[in-house]
Amino acid sequence: KVMRIRLYIILALSLLTSSVWAQNRLQRPEIFLGVHGGVKASTMFYNPSVKNLDILHSPLTGNGGLVFRYAEHRVCALQIECNYMQQGWAELYGSDAKSGTLYTRHLHYIEIPFLMHIGLGKKNFRGFFNLGPQIGYCIAEETKISNPGATISAQKQHDPITNRFDWGAAAGLGCYYRTNKIGVFQLEARFSFSLGGVFDVGQLHYFKMASPMGLSVNLGYLWEFKKRK
């Protein structure tokens, strides 16, 4: 009897979800293409741990790219991006930033996020949530030392990276304003975390984990190719 009740509940919820989904389907798909860009702070999660600056005290870098969004539903859409971004980490040698030496490592990536875009609110002004996986490839790396005359002992994390391919996940919160004639303006804060590693990781290697993580704030502009009737 309990199993039968559960089946009835599941069936009722399924029918309700299908009904809501059908009612919120658009008469015709919406297609957006645009650009976005902003600043990003990043750090690294190491195991064994490495003393690097946390994400809120790391130097800011730039990021930006193209945005494609496809929607057949009022709430959910698919968003694919192609971005250039920098991530890495910073290490402070000394008691403070003024008297000490800052070692900064920047990794330059081309990344492609595949995101589920969920929008809530009124037609013109809406909040949204983005969530999904992303892949990337490191096209260059650079090292900066604030005091070139300083002596910094070489450590494992100072070696050239061994894994240029990156994969991970991203989640963002934001809002946008949709005008009637000149497109969509949006603001988003996004957190990303790599599930791979910039160095070889595992039981046979020095690092068990060497994963970048970042927090970015971006402004964007999207143009709608098809207007709703």
Would you name each region that the model predicts?
Residues 32, 36, 63, 130, ...:
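Short glycine/serine/threonine-biased micro-segments
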Residues 1-32, 36, 215-229:
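Bacterial Sec-dependent N-terminal signal peptides
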Residues 29-31, 58-62, 106-110, 125, ...:
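Residues that define the transmembrane beta-barrel architecture of outer-membrane proteins
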Residues 149-152:
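Short helix-loop boundary/capping segments
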Residues 49-54, 97-103, 154-161, 203-209:
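Extracellular loop and loop/strand-boundary signature of outer-membrane beta-barrel proteins
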Residues 23, 27-31, 41-45, 69-147, ...:
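Gram-negative (and chloroplast) outer-membrane scaffold detector with strong preference
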Residues 22-67, 224, 229:
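Short glycine/proline- and aromatic-enriched beta-strand/turn motifs that initiate or cap beta-hairpins
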Residues 164-166, 171, 177-229:
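Predominantly the C-terminal beta-signal and adjacent terminal strand-loop region
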